[in-house]
Amino acid sequence: MNKKILSILIGAALAIAGGITAYSLMRSHADVALASVPKTATAIVRLDVMTFLHDADFSTKEGKQLIQQLMQSENIEQPGVDLNSPVYAFITENGDFGVSATVDDADVLAENLSHLMQQGHATAIEKQRGFQWSAIDQKWLMCFDDDKALLMGPSVGAAQDALRTKMVGLMQQSTKECAASSPFYMHLKEKHEPIAAIAEADVLPNDIREMLMKQLKVSSLEDIQLALGLGTQKDVVRIDADLITEQADLKQRLTDLNAIFRPIKGQLVNRADESSLLWTVCNVKGEQLLELLRKFPNLRTALIGLNTIVDFDLMLKAVDGDVTTECTSLSFVLGWKRQLPVRLLACLDNEDFLKQSDYWIKSAAATPAYELMASTPKDFVLAFDERQAWFGVKDKVLYLTGSSSLANADKASAPNAYLVGERSEIKGLRFFASLDIQPLTVLISTFAGSTPLDRLLLFQRINLEMGDVGHFTIKFVAPEGSDVVKKIILGK
């Protein structure tokens, strides 16, 4: 073989081998902290600190300020742990909380603990079983070596001695023994946000567990996990949530709902009222939606009541396409107005139900509590209990509202400035909702004073998106250029 060709082949082989070795070392380094996470953990959170700070546009100075804030000391220049590698938090099957991080300088970490000791927040470092140890605020036990650090608790007294033994086992376990080899962790690995989490539904707070069981119609949360991802996009804080289950009945229910809530076409986006407090949209076939509504006792009773005057079932069966609901103000809730500022719009397959309008009017006339009037062959007003409801059809779109102003508003498509940024994203989703939170937070602040909800005033609205049933995205949307994440974290 030609010596030149041989040299090229050897060089290429060495380059490939070197690349593989470097990649393996980087992977090994990146996963050092993961090696201390137990395989039996019921919840795991992964935090990519530098990615999060980069996405939130933190400067070096602001990043340093955040570290000092977290370490409760202005004297700390570097944390001693590698913030370019993931930090893991977890909950054990016994309910212990833990945090694992990769160490990049054990001496710096020890020095930082000495600063905390001088402030009365940590005990003097002692060496035991091959690791350095310190108790932070008496109930959080920390151990570290040159590779990784582990913090666990809360625990005191004899329980802390038992925890120390458990921590030694976690620090010494192999890759095969840690969470990295568990199917549970694989769900977390699929999340690419700078902050990601996977949790067994059973470890959630009782209130949330009860709500989930009620909404999912299950008697147990066994074999149900929630995967979460949090990231920032300019002036948006985004949370992605996935419901993961092996329960056969629940999987079938989610599949059925996926068939009912079809991809949104965007047919009614331009009709959103610019003053909408709440706006929702989905795409359904009326007959399937009616079957779903009848499964809920309260809604089934309400439908029976509506059908005594108007054939609401027939009206609903004609729906085929995008459906929107909107609430334009809090006036009704506060008792300032008797008219309900809510409107429903729905694309129709047909208008056959209008053929029953003469029968509706006769039925209402025979019922003293109701009065039904037709302003046009396709527009009606129903009066009952000193209230009124307007409904009808315009351009093959059904409208139903409790407000005369919304009933008389232009029902044809007219471009407006509302939801301009989201308009292209709405198409293809199975559900979308947008809530203007400014009026709500101002109202709460007015009557309740300062509360943790004041932070919501930094945002304009909250959007809820559903791709497939079981996958949700919540977006907190702030004014452009507001640096909302910095304001929340640094308190600016």
Where are these regions (language model features)?
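Single conserved position on a long alpha-helix in the C-terminal lobe of the eukaryotic protein kinase
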Residues: 45, 79-183, 324-425
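Leucine-rich, highly hydrophobic segment in Treponema pallidum outer-membrane-associated proteins
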Residues: 16-18, 174-283, 287-290, 427-492
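Short extracytoplasmic
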Residues: 41-67
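Hydrophobic membrane-insertion alpha-helices, especially the h-region
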Residues: 7-22
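Ser/Thr/Pro/Gly-rich low-complexity linker/stalk segments immediately outside membranes or between
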Residues: 22-44
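Positively charged n-region of N-terminal signal peptides that target proteins for export
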Residues: 1-5
